[in-house]
Amino acid sequence: MVFAFWKVFLILSCLAGQVSVVQVTIPDGFVNVTVGSNVTLICIYTTTVASREQLSIQWSFFHKKEMEPISIYFSQGGQAVAIGQFKDRITGSNDPGNASITISHMQPADSGIYICDVNNPPDFLGQNQGILNVSVLVKPSKPLCSVQGRPETGHTISLSCLSALGTPSPVYYWHKLEGRDIVPVKENFNPTTGILVIGNLTNFEQGYYQCTAINRLGNSSCEIDLTSSHPEVGIIVGALIGSLVGAAIIISVVCFARNKAKAKAKERNSKTIAELEPMTKINPRGESEAMPREDATQLEVTLPSSIHETGPDTIQEPDYEPKPTQEPAPEPAPGSEPMAVPDLDIELELEPETQSELEPEPEPEPESEPGVVVEPLSEDEKGVVKA
């Protein structure tokens, strides 16, 4: 009986010695590490092959956002290399049977699944792979508080609170600030989403609210003002609008007055030019031209030589300048000598429509002075004068 037992034991031992097996052990499959710190991922292995020349160790990383794992560390024959985002951050163990690695300066993006693979040909059987789930813990970042709806009495509003970072996911709590006291809100809210709904805002519910995001690493908070009335804001806005309207009115009045002044000045200049136009058309030859040249009549007056000799009994009369008319000269008294009178060329500028000859109206004959005889020109003399 005892002989038979030892016989079976020897047979099983021989069979086990002929099978090559690699066994990988992971002491802790869940690892939590705070952001910025170092973490050691423990992976222990055993192999039935004494030689380590063909031994290879590989670590892979599977991010939750990635579809396939990526290789981050590989070691074989004493040579190790880190790859990708973990380059220069991974240090591997050189101890036999220890495939652990240490990652420095962990970041939120390093959270995910890590896979340890150990191979030592000809050991191909057994459990040569281990899996670790690593979470990088992050304190909640300062949440963003916002309000949807009009924060006025009688309106329905909702308050939201959300932190962009935080591992594990934070939970949210709402409180109302009453002076120095922090009072939990009476309304129901969702601690997972951080949404607080106020169905009918009253004066009692108006004020300042605080939201706090909490996880195992810490907490952060934000505040929001639900004061519906802000008189100072209304005054500022009203003053600003009034200033803009007043400036616009002033600019309009100034522009209108300027344009009106320009129009009056332009009208005044045009009237002045119209009044000065007739003056600019005066004949440069002087006032001696009063009639057209073709209507000019030359008169010859003969005065006695005794006109220059005035006796003591002669009464001097004012000089008389004959008018430039075409009436015939009065007949001289008999016995007087004719006196030559300077020829007078009289021209009159007539309108185009009145170019026809005008018949001179007879004027009363001036009283002849004593001793002065004016004889009319004969037809022959008139012809000579006209020639």
Curated annotation (Swiss-Prot):
Q: Where is the composition biased (Pro residues)?
A: 325-335
* TM ranges: 233-253
Q: Which domain of life is it from?
A: Eukaryota
Q: Which residues lie on this side of the membrane: Cytoplasmic?
A: 254-387
What GO cellular component entries does it have?
basolateral plasma membrane
Q: Which cysteines are joined by disulfide bonds?
A: 43-116, 161-211
Question: In what residue span(s) does the Ig-like C2-type domain sit?
Answer: 140-227
Q: Which residues belong to the signal peptide in this entry?
A: 1-21
Ig-like V-type domain: from which residue to which, for each copy?
A: 22-132
**Polar residues compositional bias: what residue ranges?**
299-308
Q: Which residues lie on this side of the membrane: Extracellular?
A: 22-232
Instruction: Tell me what PTMs the record reports for this protein.
Output: Highly N-glycosylated. Appears not to contain significant amounts of O-linked carbohydrates or sialic acid in its sugar moieties.
Query: Which intervals of the chain are annotated as region Disordered?
Result: 266-387
Q: Where is the composition biased (Basic and acidic residues)?
A: 284-296
Give the subcellular location: Membrane
InterPro entries from the xrefs? Ig-like_dom (IPR007110), Ig-like_dom_sf (IPR036179), Ig-like_fold (IPR013783), Ig_sub (IPR003599), Ig_sub2 (IPR003598), Ig_V-set (IPR013106), Myelin_P0-rel (IPR000920), VSIG1 (IPR029861)
Q: Which UniProt keywords apply?
A: Disulfide bond, Glycoprotein, Immunoglobulin domain, Membrane, Repeat, Signal, Transmembrane, Transmembrane helix
Instruction: Point to the regions of Acidic residues compositional bias.
Output: 344-368
Glycosylation is annotated at 32, 38, 133, 200, 219
Question: What GO biological process terms are annotated to this protein in UniProt?
Answer: epithelial cell morphogenesis; maintenance of gastrointestinal epithelium
Membrane topology annotation: Single-pass type I membrane protein
Tissue specificity statement from the Swiss-Prot or TrEMBL entry: Detected only in stomach mucosa and testis, and to a much lesser level in pancreas (at protein level). Detected in gastric cancers (31%), esophageal carcinomas (50%) and ovarian cancers (23%).
**Cited PANTHER family:** V-SET AND IMMUNOGLOBULIN DOMAIN-CONTAINING PROTEIN 1
Which protein are we looking at?
A: V-set and immunoglobulin domain-containing protein 1
Species per Swiss-Prot/TrEMBL record:
Homo sapiens (Human)
